UniProtKB/Swiss-Prot annotation:
This is PAN2-PAN3 deadenylation complex catalytic subunit PAN2. Residues 917-1091 form the Exonuclease domain. Contains a pseudo-UCH domain. This ubiquitin C-terminal hydrolase (UCH)-like or ubiquitin specific protease (USP)-like domain is predicted to be catalytically inactive because it lacks the active site catalytic triad characteristic of thiol proteases, with residues at the equivalent structural positions that are incompatible with catalysis, and it cannot bind ubiquitin. It functions as a structural scaffold for intra- and intermolecular interactions in the complex. One of its GO terms (molecular function) is nucleic acid binding. Keywords: Cytoplasm, Exonuclease, Hydrolase, Metal-binding, mRNA processing, Nuclease, Repeat, WD repeat. It is an enzyme of class 3 (hydrolase). The gene is PAN2. It catalyses: Exonucleolytic cleavage of poly(A) to 5'-AMP. Belongs to the peptidase C19 family. PAN2 subfamily. It comes from Debaryomyces hansenii (strain ATCC 36239 / CBS 767 / BCRC 21394 / JCM 1990 / NBRC 0083 / IGC 2968). Catalytic subunit of the poly(A)-nuclease (PAN) deadenylation complex, one of two cytoplasmic mRNA deadenylases involved in mRNA turnover. PAN specifically shortens poly(A) tails of RNA and the activity is stimulated by poly(A)-binding protein PAB1. PAN deadenylation is followed by rapid degradation of the shortened mRNA tails by the CCR4-NOT complex. Deadenylated mRNAs are then degraded by two alternative mechanisms, namely exosome-mediated 3'-5' exonucleolytic degradation, or deadenylation-dependent mRNA decaping and subsequent 5'-3' exonucleolytic degradation by XRN1.
Length: 1124
């Protein structure tokens, strides 16, 4: 194998436009004709044929000219692989397989739609099934077989796992998996007969020759530390396997790192090995001392394109059928062709068939008119016309975007329902048709000039303030009732370089009622949680159970039942309600509730988990999921009450029914009682509505149907069925009557109507009533709109969850859920973190086609007031259980290996209002941040990383002998995947949070959270550094009067730079802290000492001068501690 070298090099995929240039992704020599196939990253296929030329070339002997060029993939998917066929060439891309003849005409295209196989995507490789050229085996996430003679269906093999490479032998398929494993698969028995584990990282290439398989790949590089990312290194060996004996043979060493390996097609003992850096080696596998080594020139011959290390690589190594040529590509769109010297052959195979040439039509003969400077253009005639030409417009006429008038978009739902026979056109929804609509130019549209989004807090100056006239985000009514006002829109949280803390939530809420953030998982539940929060009866009942203790810590609950937080839906709901009581208009998070919900097995089975902000749900699916969640919430809270405290929601939301079954034909007469927590509102049939209306009533009376008619029909049912016991001897009917016998203080009504049913209630102007009365007679409950006595119970509308449809109901990701809630005789709109007052007339106006009530809630009018915990009386509450502050409660019980670094509180040290405590928390990252990088290098934060509490330390802060002694030092148990332990910042090492190996004081999240919640309600003063971010990640709202944050004390707003705890300790305390990994006990104690120093400087009147000196010293030291 002497004398090999480069004989040709062409820029195969280069283009005159830099934008259109694309990389070579696949190469293949044709086995029928003298062609070399080349595929690029944009799905284009080219073929080249060798030709003799007299033009001087930089590489002698052979010139490649392009024979054909055509598109072979859908969109811009790259061509991954070629496969030769007698009648053409098969090309594989991400989601399709194309079969073209050699001129480029498409013969067959296989994709998920043509095969009716939704799993036919994410394809990676293909080959023929053993020795046939008609059965095509395609691999990716699954393994398929397609008959090219009958390409209308697929056959799936019994194989699981991602396949990245595939080849065939006489009897088997050789499957290369992405983890470095090679499987020998028998397509006849449909099973794997042997597996080889040659590489513990990735697989880069395999080749099959007879009964031998060769492979090369990567291995995992040992990590230098636990926090570093996994990396791979190229294996310096080529593995060889013998399929006759099903064992591996001695590997072939290749010190440069083997990236590609090919058997010589004519010399089975010769193997060609190549590295990505361009080193090629011909080696005899039976005599490995017989080696020929070459180095490819991967530099670019085009001087205009600089050569960089990112472009100098070798890829896509292939060998011709006669073994006389090899080809590969580099990073400059160059195709390299090699052969041995003195090779006069120009054929890639020994006996190539005739290469069909393109047909040329003779040129069309016509008399051309020569137009030059001498011949005027006006000599060429034009057709007769009367009107002015388009080019004849005034010189002062300009076309600008602001003056443009664009037509309205056609609603897709109109096109979908164009053949509907029931409601062919909804005038209420779309307005009158065939009208000349008035279009307003953009520059006259006032709404485009108004402000919808706030500035970041860091961008504001002292002159920025709220201005209702400059913002229309609170606009709830438009002149065009078919458009959705801004206050109902899907709100998006914007992130600056300072994260979510820089977003101005106060821009959207100027009330004392708190909104909920919507950038978390399962944020669709916000509107329903806000509705239940402002029901005094429901809220008071839920939060009073927080006084009691339920802290499961057994490993069965934590691991087997999938509840690592040791919490429940009931507890987390109570914490949310209490947090919203304390926040007084500040935004709140539902992260802990969402995590417990996501790990709830019942919620998973009912498909209530949503992690994409409902982007894949249409209007019907959103209505269904929020209705299911309403039932799930009440039933789960009821079960939690039974399991935890031996009580239930029966006194709050339980609706009682009597079901009577009787017959006149036999002696069946049964009466049963049942109950449910919610009501599924049913629309009466048309004939029932006509009975309710009465045929003799006037037109005005017919429009007075309301929700009470629907409630009465839904709760009082009557039907007849055949008696199964007596059907043969004496046929007769059974009468089944359901009657309402009890209504609770809170009535939760699910309104999951169809589109036609919603259209019907929009015709009733007073369908949603603000109040109604119930009467009890003969142990039955009936509804009345008005009352004339004191024997009835009065119910008032608390509010309802409303779906906002933007565009067609079939569109996904365009719709929103809001809630209208009546609080202290005033109505408010809650749209996640937007809260605003709204007129009562707007609440009861259901005539908008985009506005649909989904969950309606009524409550007794004589309900109690809202209850909340007060610091002065919290410790004296009779049901309070605060024993967790004075004892250990480890997850899985107390273990001997646990190392304690704290001293528990005693009853003599019981905290009370004003008790000073120092706190610091450490976190781990469960998910990395999501970034959007633009072509110009601009990075936008789409979603911040998800931090989870890992350690919490609380120290005694009052003056005394135990000042600075910790009494809480909890490590939070984690059973889920942790993306980054943030060891340099948190001090948490891998294994510290694992219940099977940790030596730390592991507790559940709810155990530690309850300790902080008790300290908060007891009135303790929290001292720390950067507490705003800590409390946000913990999901705990602490009022400002209970926070002493040293990051805020030692801060000059005009300089807009906050000082680190490490730097402040060095300047003020003359101590170096955080010299290694962070320790939360050390950080909390340092913050406590800084606070004491602040009090000392303030008392002697030197704080201001000291603060300015700190900043001056910081500028000289660049705010860094020397030698740190």
């Amino acid at each position: 194998m002497e004398g090999w070298g480069e004989i040709s090099r062409i820029a195969a995929t280069a283009s005159s436009s830099v934008i259109d240039n694309s990389k070579i992704t696949s190469l293949q020599f044709d086995n029928q004709q003298n062609l070399l196939w080349c595929g690029d990253s944009k799905g284009t296929t080219r073929s080249f044929t060798p030709q003799s030329t007299s033009i001087p070339m930089p590489y002698p002997a052979l010139h490649l000219s392009q024979y054909s060029k055509f598109k072979t993939s859908l969109g811009t998917s790259p061509v991954k692989q070629y496969l030769n066929h007698q009648k053409g060439i098969l090309s594989l891309s991400h989601n399709c397989v194309n079969f073209n003849n050699r001129r480029g005409l498409t013969q067959l295209s296989l994709n998920s739609e043509s095969l009716k196989e939704p799993g036919f995507n994410n394809l990676s490789c293909m080959t023929f099934n053993s020795n046939t050229n008609n059965d095509l085996v395609i691999a990716g996430d699954s393994l398929f077989k397609v008959d090219l003679l009958k390409p209308n269906m697929t056959t799936s093999f019994n194989h699981t796992g991602k396949v990245s490479m595939i080849d065939n032998t006489l009897n088997y398929l050789t499957l290369g998996k992405s983890n470095g494993e090679i499987e020998i698969f028998d397509p006849v028995s449909n099973q794997t007969v042997k597996s080889f584990y040659g590489h513990n990282g990735l697989l880069s290439d395999i080749d099959v020759q007879g009964n031998y398989v060769a492979s090369c790949g990567y291995s995992l590089r040992p990590r230098r530390n636990q926090a570093s990312q996994s990396s791979y290194m190229i294996d310096p060996l080529v593995n060889i396997y013998d399929l006759r004996m099903m064992r591996s043979l001695p590997p072939i060493p290749f010190s440069a790192g083997a990236s590609f390996v090919k058997f010589h097609p004519k010399l089975p003992n010769i193997m060609i090995i190549a590295s990505s850096l361009g080193q090629l080696q011909f080696v005899d596998i039976y005599d490995q001392s017989n080696v020929y080594l070459y180095q490819a020139d991967l530099s670019n011959v085009n001087a205009s394109t600089p050569t960089t290390s990112s472009n100098t690589y070798l890829a896509n190594l292939e060998v011709s059928g006669n073994g006389e040529f090899i080809t590969f590509s580099d990073g400059f769109q160059n195709l390299h062709l090699w052969s041995f010297k003195n090779n006069n052959s120009k054929n890639f195979i020994n006996f190539p068939s005739y290469l069909e040439q393109p047909d040329f039509s003779p040129p069309f003969q016509q008399n051309h008119i020569n137009v030059d400077d001498v011949v005027p253009l006006s000599s060429i005639g034009m057709p007769y016309y009367k009107d002015l030409l388009l080019s004849n417009y005034a010189s002062d006429l300009h076309f600008t975007k602001e003056l443009s008038k664009l037509p309205n978009h056609l609603d897709p739902e109109l096109l979908q329902n164009q053949y509907s026979q029931v409601l062919p056109y909804n005038t209420l929804k779309y307005g009158k048709r065939n009208l000349n609509k008035f279009y307003v130019p953009l520059q006259n549209n006032v709404s485009t000039k108004q402000k919808l989004f706030p500035k970041f807090i860091s961008e504001k100056n002292g002159h920025d303030s709220f201005d209702n006239e400059n913002s229309n985000i609170f606009e709830y009514k438009l002149s065009n009732k078919f458009e959705v006002p801004n206050c109902y829109s899907n709100l998006k949280i914007q992130y600056s370089k300072f994260g979510v803390e820089d977003f101005d939530f106060s821009f959207y809420n100027r009330t004392k009622y708190s909104g909920l953030e919507n950038h978390l998982d399962n944020s669709y539940i916000n509107s329903l949680l806000q509705l239940y929060k402002y029901s005094p009866v429901f809220q008071n009942f839920i939060i009073k159970h927080l006084l009691k203790e339920w802290l499961p810590n057994d490993l069965t609950t934590i691991i087997q039942n999938g509840n690592p937080q040791g919490s429940s839906i009931l507890n987390e709901l109570g914490y949310i309600f209490d947090m919203m009581n304390k926040s007084h208009g500040k935004n709140c998070k539902t992260s802990n509730f969402s995590n417990v919900l996501s790990q709830n097995q019942v919620a998973q089975m009912q498909e209530l988990i949503n992690k994409d902000d409902c982007k894949n749900l249409n209007a019907f699916e959103i209505r269904a999921i929020i209705g299911k969640f309403n039932k799930f919430l009440l039933s789960t809270c009821n079960n939690d009450l039974l399991n935890q405290f031996n009580t239930s929601l029966s006194e709050i939301t339980n609706i009682g029914y009597e079901i009577e079954i009787k017959s006149n034909g036999c002696n069946i007469n049964n009466v049963n009682y049942n109950s449910q927590l919610t009501v599924d509102l049913m629309s009466p049939p048309i004939n029932k509505l006509s009975i309710l209306i009465s045929a003799n009533s006037t037109s005005a009376t017919k429009k007075n149907l309301n929700i009470l008619n629907y409630l009465d029909y839904s709760m009082n049912q009557f039907k007849t069925i055949k008696c199964q016991q007596c059907n043969n001897s004496f046929p007769h009917l059974l009468e089944i009557r359901q009657s309402l016998v009890h209504l609770p203080p809170v009535i939760s009504i699910n309104v999951n109507f169809t589109g036609q049913e919603f259209n019907l209630i929009q015709n009733f102007p007073n369908w949603l009533v603000p109040e109604f009365y119930t009467y009890g007679m003969n142990n039955k409950v009936s509804f009345k709109l008005h009352s004339n006595d004191n024997l009835s119970n009065k119910y008032e509308l608390l509010g309802y969850v409303c779906e906002i449809n933007v565009g067609s109901e079939f569109l996904k990701g365009k719709h929103n859920l809001v809630s209208y809630i009546k609080i202290e005789s005033k109505w408010y709109l809650f749209n996640d973190f937007l809260v605003m007052p709204i007129p009562e007339s707007e609440v009861f106006d259901l005539s908008y086609h985009w506005k649909k009530p989904i969950i309606v809630m009524y409550q007794l009018a004589n309900h109690a007031d809202f209850g909340s915990f007060q610091q002065q009386s919290f410790a004296q509450l009779p049901d309070l259980n605060d024993s967790i502050l004075y004892r250990d409660h480890f997850a899985g019980g107390i273990r001997d290996s646990i190392k304690r670094e704290y001293e528990l509180l005693t009853k003599d040290e019981a905290p009370n209002a004003g008790t000073l405590i120092a706190i610091d928390a450490e976190f781990v990252a469960l998910n990395p941040e999501e970034l959007e990088v633009h072509y110009g290098g601009v990075r936008n934060l789409i979603k911040p990383r998800n931090l989870s509490l890992a350690r919490i330390s609380v120290l005694r802060g009052d003056n005394g002998p135990k000042q600075g002694v910790p009494f809480i030092d909890d490590y939070i148990i984690h059973t889920c995947f942790i993306d980054d332990y943030l060891t340099s910042f948190s001090g948490i090492e891998p294994g510290d949070l694992d219940p099977s190996s940790s030596t730390k004081t592991l507790t559940t999240l709810q155990t530690s959270y309850r300790k902080l919640w008790l300290l908060l309600n007891l009135g303790c003063i929290f001292v720390g550094h950067g507490l705003q971010n800590d409390f946000r990640c913990i999901n705990l709202h602490v009022p400002k009067n209970q926070i002493r944050d040293t990051a805020d004390f030692f801060y000059l707003p005009e300089l807009k730079r906050k000082l680190s705890l490490k730097f402040l300790a060095y300047i003020l305390l003359k101590e170096k802290v955080q010299t290694g990994n962070h320790d939360s006990i050390e950080d909390a104690n340092t913050a406590l000492l800084l606070y004491k120093k602040y009090l000392e400087l303030t008392a002697i009147g030197e704080f201001e001068s000291t603060l300015h000196r700190i900043y001056m010293d910081g500028q000289q030291l660049r705010f860094r501690v020397p030698d740190s």
